[in-house]
Amino acid sequence: ATLAPTVLIFPPSPAELATGTATIVCVANKYFPDGTVTWQVDGKPLTTGIETSKTPQNSDDCTYNLSSTLTLKSDEYNSHDEYTCQVAQGSGSPVVQSFSRKNC
């Protein structure tokens, strides 16, 4: 059975932005089978500055968890608006979470 993840995305804090760095974190919890994370900025795929770590399967329910971190310079972060994290499992629809900088 496929279990879709709960996906959350966290924008960088103003305190961090003030240091010149922006870290955006995407967390996906309790999903099966294993999946992949992709990031988009203003609708375009992004492949650099990403670090993803997965936890091993949970022995109780065989699900996975992951967290993916996108790190940018503050200037670059401020020059874009929409940040999107997608978690895809096989052929199903990916679970998508995004935020718009204008709304934060």
UniProtKB/Swiss-Prot annotation:
* Cysteine-cysteine disulfides: 26-85
In terms of Gene3D superfamilies, this protein maps to: Immunoglobulins
**Keywords, sorted A to Z:** Disulfide bond, Immunoglobulin domain
User: Which SMART domains does this chain map to?
Assistant: IGc1 (SM00407)
**Residue ranges of the Ig-like domain?**
5-100
Family matches, as InterPro entries: Ig-like_dom, Ig-like_dom_sf, Ig-like_fold, Ig_C1-set, Immune_Resp_Modulators
- Pfam families of this UniProt entry? C1-set
Q: Which SUPFAM superfamilies match?
A: Immunoglobulin
- Lineage, top-rank taxon, reads Eukaryota
For this protein, the record's PANTHER family field holds: TAPASIN
Other noteworthy facts: The cDNA from which this sequence was derived contains a terminator codon within the V-region coding region. The origin of this codon and of the differences between this and other sequenced b5 C regions are unclear. The cDNA clone was made using mRNA from trypanosome-infected b5-homozygous rabbits.
* UniProt name for this protein: Ig kappa chain b5 variant C region
Identify the species of origin. Answer: Oryctolagus cuniculus (Rabbit)
